[in-house]
Amino acid sequence: MDVRCINWFESHGENRFLYLKSRCRNGETVFIRFPHYFYYVVTDEIYQSLSPPPFNARPMGKMRTIDIDETISYNLDIKDRKCSVADMWLIEEPKKRSIQNATMDEFLNISWFYISNGISPDGCYSLDEQYLTKINNGCYHCDDPRNCFAKEIPRFDIPRSYLFLDIECHFDKKFPSVFINPISHTSYCYIDLSGKRLLFTLINEEMLTEQEIQEAVDRGCLRIQSLMEMDYERELVLCSEIVLLRIAKQLLELTFDYVVTFNGHNFDLRYITNRLELLTGEKIIFRSPDKKEAVHLCIYERNQSSHKGVCGMANTTFHVNNNNGTIFFDLYSFIQKSEKLDSYKLDSISKNAFSCMGKVLNRGVREMTFIGDDTTDAKGKADTFAKVLTTGNYVTVDEDIICKVIRKDILENGFKVVLSCPTLPNDIYKLSFGKDDIDLAQMYKDYNLNIALDMARYCIHDACLCQYLWEYYGVETKTDAGAATYVLPQSMVFEYRASTIIKGPLLKLLLETKTILVRSETKQKFPYEGGKVFAPKQKMFSNNVLIFDYNSLYPNVCIFGNLSPETLVGVVVSTNRLEEEINNQLLLQKYPPPRYITVHCEPRLPNLISEIAIFDRSIEGTIPRLLRTFLAERARYKKMLKQATSSTEKAIYDSMQYTYKIVANSVYGLMGFRNSALYSYASAKSCTSIGRRMILYLESVLNGAELSNGMLRFANTLSNPFYMDDRDINPIVKTSLPIDYRFRFRSVYGDTDSVFTEIDSQDVDKSIEIAKELERLINSRVLFNNFKIEFEAVYKNLIMQSKKKYTTMKYSASSNSKSVPERINKGTSETRRDVSKFHKNMIKTYKTRLSEMLSEGRMNSNQVCIDILRSLETDLRSEFDSRSSPLELFMLSRMHHSNYKSADNPNMYLVTEYNKNNPETIELGERYYFAYICPANVPWTKKLVNIKTYETIIDRSFKLGSNQRIFYEVYFKRLTSEIVNLLDNKVLCISFFQRMFGSRPTFYEA
């Protein structure tokens, strides 16, 4: 029997079992049940003394136990690490057992199961059926997984089944209550193992009149009275809410491979199950594959107060307790963890994921026709957009113009769509799927058949969006890749933090190397310095800036320095200069490079003036070996990705290489995380110290380098910053570039693992050509050992606000001057949620203007400053006088919470007062909108005081009174503060700011 592993899960009844859900080549689903064990590692001496004897025991052979406590010394008299070798046993017990002096107890039982039996969680196997006992059709029991799964076979493709769903609930206030608000719609996208896709929506007929129901039937809707009458081939079905809920129960109890929702764990599934129980007393019941355990669908929460999120709110996750092998997957939770977005609402996420440049085909009366294909945007983008358009009802044009779809045609490689849209002047616009221009509260207030049918379209679109996002993010292949890499069940891949997912690969490596790492002392936690961030040399750059990144800097630092808790010889500290000088002189004699590396770090305690960590590089340590494995596997999958021919193979290999990248980059963080199995304070701080020296070294050779006559003169000798080696240190290097090229280079910024180098040219093509040659020369002549850099991009018209804040037009390494550059806003107000739309629109306008000025190159920095400030004053005065912009542009949002130090915090007071006077109260954890409002007769106010008192909560019913105005000056001052930080002339900026607002601006720290 050939099977591919799909998912692993446990039952937690009186008799605990581990289950495998697998699929055969013919599409048949097979469940295999295994005994569940707790695992313990003990020495032979302890094993022999156990009474009663262990349930099962496996010899592990001789293993080396190393004490990895850090040795701190004030001189070079460092004691050797404690190390012992003994025969070890792996004990399996069906129930927890207290065993003294057991080791390796930090690893998960499931990881022990996989590794001890030689099973890959996502592998394909030819099962030896003599080790299988049939329980029922499709379910077997196995007591000997090692022999049963002994033959691994090449991967083969299998079909999967999915249920994507969304619901709509009636509400008359702010949020539906399961006790009073019925479900009006449930929409499903059902994909079975044959690949057949069914789209259907159930509409609650109890919210319609009998006349409307009859009209709906006349229009082609199916009306049913019971579950037995359901026809899943029909797109629209009318039924009572009880029938609607029973159909949901029937679908959710099926054993799909995946049930996918967006925030469904916290809302949709919870609402369905609670409403079902309220109206019928029934529950959604899952049964284990052996039919011996039944559990009710229950959503349980995990509150991790130690990992607080935004505004001090505890990080809460929601989980479904099923035992039938289905993976209930919440896209909302997944995207929150994997993407950094301004908003995690479905419309914002879909807008970010599904966009395409569209060409204007025709302009009509308040309507426009757009076409999109492989000529209007990158290959495949129009095709993806067209897929989403099949169920889409609204399209967002140019970021914020929401247009209703009038007609749509899905073409072979794109689309044609007619939108209800004001006439727009340009020929090319960005089209995206954002917020539908509907008000659900108003729709329920005016509810009738037409509205019910409209809502059905919105609901099925949201259900299908779950499918589109599922495919866009490649969740399925990421799940399989994560299971293989982390040695975890597919259902648990996204459940754990990095400190837990690293345990599987670490355990695998320790068993391969026959190593046990132990500590006898309490882990100490001290702060340490992070990566090097350079101060920007200037604000605006008319010349191009080349961006070079170290490839996996911290992983390669760990490999280069052999940084690991067991390779740490010791840490030498000094309390005075004499001690420091003596230690420095003797260190290199006792611990000569390259076998040893000495790393100067910042002292851990205030009474120390120096701290030096010494690592032995003769035998590769656990962390470097782990990282080398990850990086090698990533390189292997990247190579396979390039050679792959099918889209399935490409998706799998891309997910695998990405997974290895993420887990490799997480190792550095885990070295400094006290609860991690990889915790090593000296290794973590040595890693950042070496990283800082590497970025300073690269900056020193590039800052002032010159290219002429086909020769590149680096600005410094090419000396290894850690110890002398046999490399050629001559800074003059022959290039393959034309001899008439004459350029100078200047380092203008750097951050942790990247260097920004200005070239005195505005030619994109030449800049890319030179940067690629620079990359080759740096890797072959400047860098050493396993360090490599990569030319990432050319930044054109770079505007540096401060450290980690900049705006630019990015030309990637694979592009040219004819390519459409990508606008990058890093750390700026355009990417923040606590900034008004007015501010974002204005700052975007002024950055674009600055960028154009830099491109033209006709003005010096003083002229640019004068022109920008003059224009800004005109715009602000005009807006203040006309007061024409809508209130929506000035609304801000904030999360309501109670985690304030002061009991009378004005934010808390604002919400408390609002809740006293409004039936729709703002709950803890909820975002609310507010704006600064003042009396209409207040003149331009220079000196802004007590601005918190002008905050007003904006809800659906709020209207700006004739005696009120927007307190523009608050917004103008914030906007101006950001704009003056883009300009180079501080004197002019201070003068302008004082004239407008009566105070000096705050300049960002360099």
UniProtKB/Swiss-Prot annotation:
Keywords, sorted A to Z: DNA recombination, DNA replication, DNA-binding, DNA-directed DNA polymerase, Early protein, Hydrolase, Multifunctional enzyme, Nucleotidyltransferase, Transferase, Viral DNA replication
Pfam families: DNA_pol_B, DNA_pol_B_3, DNA_pol_B_exo1, DNAP_B_exo_N
A biological process term (GO) from this entry: DNA replication
The UniProt record lists the keyword DNA-binding: yes
Broad class of enzyme this protein falls into: transferase
Keyword Transport applies: no
Catalyses which reaction(s): DNA(n) + a 2'-deoxyribonucleoside 5'-triphosphate = DNA(n+1) + diphosphate
A GO MF term: DNA binding
Induction (UniProt): Expressed in the early phase of the viral replicative cycle.
Subunit structure: Interacts with OPG148. Component of the Uracil-DNA glycosylase(UDG)-OPG148-polymerase complex; OPG148 and OPG116/UDG form a heterodimeric processivity factor that associates with OPG071 to form the processive polymerase holoenzyme.
Protein family according to the UniProt entry: Belongs to the DNA polymerase type-B family.
Function of the protein: Catalyzes DNA synthesis. Acquires processivity by associating with a heterodimeric processivity factor comprised of the viral OPG148 and OPG116 proteins, thereby forming the DNA polymerase holoenzyme. Displays 3'- to 5' exonuclease activity. Might participate in viral DNA recombination. Does not perform OPG116/D4synthesis across an abasic site.
Protein name: DNA polymerase
Organism (species): Monkeypox virus
Gene that specifies this protein: OPG071
